[in-house]
């Protein structure tokens, strides 16, 4: 026998038993962003490598270690997108969507990072994100956070996630803080682990995000970013906090919160959970006012967030909120004998036409009554319809309840659609 080909490590299949939960999640996401007036944008999976080097930053872990980059037959360096924001900005610039305009956009699709696979972190993962362009004020920061809070409400996980907030200031404020932080770290270089020493000059704010206990202990005495902010930054952040309090969104200010991408400024945030162990961040984002100009467009204020769907699915499963997903099939239509098969197919088609949202499956492949009922039960259907010679002669259909302890019923064919509609 030929050797089986396996899926690539860290790139997983979503099987039929798993897809109903994914579909439910995707439906909630689409409906929620739609209710806020956001429009979908779809971008290619493959982009120029330079796009991510210029946006994410050449000295970030993503660009240095994690991107799937290759040279095509024309000699161009291409990369499987590791995140969605840069592609959205590139598309906005290219098609004139961002020039003197406000845009509220959302996207959903697969992303790729060559990380060490573990639960909740994969090499191909699905990301959902929202991006807003052209609005510089704190009210839009509040809106994207309200939108994310609405997602948790609709998914039933509000009590299991908490919001952490910080502000990184503007470019000048962050540059002054960067110099002060480097000077502090240089004085304590011997305490820094290898990663922190590597980041000390190239991206010192990422040292604040170190998971090393000794480094975190050292940082207790480090300069505080907020001490370097001017009135505009303080006012922006204060107004955001006031708006969140006004709509009842609770938050914690985390002065050590920085994002792993270079393009963020001012507001940054993460929604975190204690239910997933080390993979606690379920949504993250912030403001990135300089990125549009950095990628060749007119300087444009921007804010957004992204979430990995695999991690949300894992959270829903961990909290056992995946149990109320409806059946994949409502009605399973069987036929007892060749003479009844054509009518059974016609009945199934009539039900699909009368009940567009009903999930109707026709038995195919023959078999006796026992075999067909076994298939019906395995399908997860609520009821099986049995069409035999007697039913055919009397213009009736037998309805067998598969999930309830109820007697089989005979229903007139012309009343069947109404009966099924009430049942499901």
Swiss-Prot record:
> Subcellular localization, per the record?
Cytoplasm
What is this enzyme's EC? 6.1.1.21
GO CC annotation terms, alphabetical:
cytoplasm
Species of origin reads Shewanella halifaxensis (strain HAW-EB4)
What is the name of this protein? Histidine--tRNA ligase
Q: Where is the signal peptide?
A: none
Q: InterPro entries this protein is in?
A: aa-tRNA-synth_II, aa-tRNA-synth_II/BPL/LPL, Anticodon-bd, Anticodon-bd_dom_sf, His-tRNA-ligase, HisRS-like_core, HisRS/HisZ, HisRS_anticodon
Could you tell me the gene encoding this protein?
A: hisS
Quaternary structure note: Homodimer.
């Amino acid at each position: 026998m030929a050797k089986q080909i396996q899926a690539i490590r860290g790139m997983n299949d979503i099987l039929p038993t798993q897809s109903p939960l994914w579909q439910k999640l995707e439906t909630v996401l689409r409906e929620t962003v739609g209710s806020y007036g956001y429009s979908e944008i779809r971008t290619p999976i493959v982009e120029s490598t330079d796009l991510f080097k210029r946006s994410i930053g050449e000295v970030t872990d993503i660009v240095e270690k994690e991107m799937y980059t290759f040279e095509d037959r024309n000699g161009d360096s291409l990369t499987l997108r590791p995140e969605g924001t840069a592609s959205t900005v590139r598309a906005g610039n290219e098609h004139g969507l961002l020039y003197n305009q406000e845009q509220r956009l959302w996207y959903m699709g697969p992303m790729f990072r060559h990380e060490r696979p573990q639960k909740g972190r994969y090499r191909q993962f699905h990301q959902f994100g929202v991006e807003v362009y052209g609005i510089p004020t704190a009210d839009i920061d509040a809106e994207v956070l309200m939108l994310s809070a609405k997602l948790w409400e609709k998914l039933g996980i509000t009590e299991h996630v908490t919001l952490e907030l910080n502000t990184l200031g503007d470019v000048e404020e962050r540059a002054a803080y960067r110099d002060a932080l480097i000077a502090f770290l240089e004085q304590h270089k011997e305490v820094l682990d290898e990663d922190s020493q590597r980041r000390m000059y190239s991206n010192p704010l990422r040292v604040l995000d170190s998971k090393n206990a000794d480094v975190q202990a050292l940082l207790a005495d480090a300069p505080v970013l907020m001490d370097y902010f001017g009135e505009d930054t303080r006012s922006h952040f204060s107004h955001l906090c006031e708006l969140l309090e006004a709509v009842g969104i609770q938050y914690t200010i985390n002065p050590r919160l920085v994002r792993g991408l270079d393009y963020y400024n001012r507001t940054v945030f993460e929604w975190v959970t204690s239910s997933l162990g080390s993979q606690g961040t379920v949504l993250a984002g912030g403001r990135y006012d300089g990125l549009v100009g950095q990628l060749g467009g007119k300087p444009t204020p921007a804010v957004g967030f992204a979430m990995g769907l695999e991690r949300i699915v894992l959270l829903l499963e961990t909290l056992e909120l995946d149990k109320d997903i409806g059946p994949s099939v409502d009605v399973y239509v069987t036929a007892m004998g060749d003479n009844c098969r054509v009518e059974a197919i016609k009945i199934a088609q009539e039900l699909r036409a009368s009940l567009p949202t009903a999930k109707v499956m026709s038995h195919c492949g023959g078999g006796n009554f026992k075999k067909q009922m076994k298939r019906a039960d395995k399908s997860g259907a609520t009821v099986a319809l049995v069409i035999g010679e007697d039913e055919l002669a009397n213009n009736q259909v037998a309805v067998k309840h598969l999930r309830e302890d109820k007697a089989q019923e005979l229903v007139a064919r012309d009343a069947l659609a109404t009966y099924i509609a009430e049942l499901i």
